[in-house]
């Protein structure tokens, strides 16, 4: 048996235990101050007792040091528990923390934090803290470029979604813009689309980073490479044949930009005027040739000749301007901001305005820029042109159901071809179809422009343009007959006492 004498106190100096000696049978006596441990113990037990005594010695020493911090006697810190505290938790927490209530209010910060932490972590009943309120929504400064509402920090500055996308596209495609004024245009949320040159310059001025765009592009490319494409698009032989026929019809009636010998003219290249007659005559001549090629393209489309003559004419009149605009916009060169016609004539934006496009100019150039991300090849352009032409929702059709049946394989062919060409971009097909809606909007404005244009030109509108692009009723007041050279594309029949009438081409 071991005897424990607890008459010792930390105030006695906290002496270390001493082993007085061993008797027979392995009896040993340990002394620590006035405490004595006697009994039959082995080496392991003696070591355990010594460790306990050493720990008690360290606690007593700590208590003495703490008492000297603020003048409290060691008895206030019950680290060395007295006999009546055995079996109770430290500081008698189950008693309501009476020991802490006895402390003065001016405890050192270290002791105050210790007491709070001990209470919160030792209590059996935890009081849940009230949920913190949600953080307020982040408010960004207005767009540094156009002062519109900002969506966050993009490429180094606070900017709106519009300016972010414009800057990204401009850098990724190495766009070169031209200012048609004094290169000092005001850029705000109303005027930001009027001058791309000044808008891009302001992006640089406010601190947008080219390098940030390149890093973002590389990251997206890496993500695309990691995608696994599981869809397979099988193409039956009859669809392959359809695609080849449409592609061949397009290429043989519309040479690509790389096949043309481009040339330019200096006529009114620097400033806008209401109408440059020299450019207008050249443009009307080229437009007439282009219309003839579109008619030839339509006749070579599979199934088009099976429609009634009336439906063929209706479809051509309705879609001719759509296809004309689509074709010229595919010959847009963003670096020089120019468009090239079928004979190689290349006009800049100002010259296109002066040639007769007028207020339609910026709308046409904006559409051309929207086509660039689609990266359509000749086959896709031909299929999209055919879909524009053979469309059952045109007014005054005799057999709209038959037209819809002819359009269905064209839609399927474009979908499969586009997805096979871009396996990682299945969204390209619907984006191409959406361009048909844009083309129709441009055609509507083009018809309005033709009516005002006839008031600006000195003579009559060229007959084929009048027949295919405009409403003939709008030109009934034209008194002078057109020159014979301009009547070649269509057949006319004149009778005495009757107005000149046109027959089907």
From Swiss-Prot:
Residues 209-237 are annotated as: Hinge. PROSITE patterns: NR_LBD, NUCLEAR_REC_DBD_1, NUCLEAR_REC_DBD_2. GO terms for cellular component: nucleus; transcription regulator complex. Residues 1-57, 113-134, 462-505 are annotated as: Disordered. A zinc finger (NR C4-type) spans 143-163, 179-203. The keyword Nucleus applies. Residues 115-124 have a biased composition (Polar residues). Residues 12-22, 32-46, 485-505 have a biased composition (Basic and acidic residues). One of its GO terms (molecular function) is zinc ion binding. Keywords: DNA-binding, Metal-binding, Nucleus, Receptor, Transcription, Transcription regulation, Zinc, Zinc-finger. Residues 143-208 bind DNA. Residues 52-142 are annotated as: Modulating. It comes from the Eukaryota. InterPro entries: NHR-like_dom_sf (IPR035500), NR_DBD_RAR (IPR047159), NR_LBD_RAR (IPR047158), Nucl_hrmn_rcpt_lig-bd (IPR000536), Nuclear_hrmn_rcpt (IPR001723), Retinoic_acid_rcpt (IPR003078), Znf_hrmn_rcpt (IPR001628), Znf_NHR/GATA (IPR013088). Composed of three domains: a modulating N-terminal domain, a DNA-binding domain and a C-terminal ligand-binding domain. Heterodimer; with a RXR molecule. Binds DNA preferentially as a RAR/RXR heterodimer. Receptor for retinoic acid. Retinoic acid receptors bind as heterodimers to their target response elements in response to their ligands, all-trans or 9-cis retinoic acid, and regulate gene expression in various biological processes. The RAR/RXR heterodimers bind to the retinoic acid response elements (RARE) composed of tandem 5'-AGGTCA-3' sites known as DR1-DR5. Belongs to the nuclear hormone receptor family. NR1 subfamily. This is Retinoic acid receptor gamma. It comes from Notophthalmus viridescens.
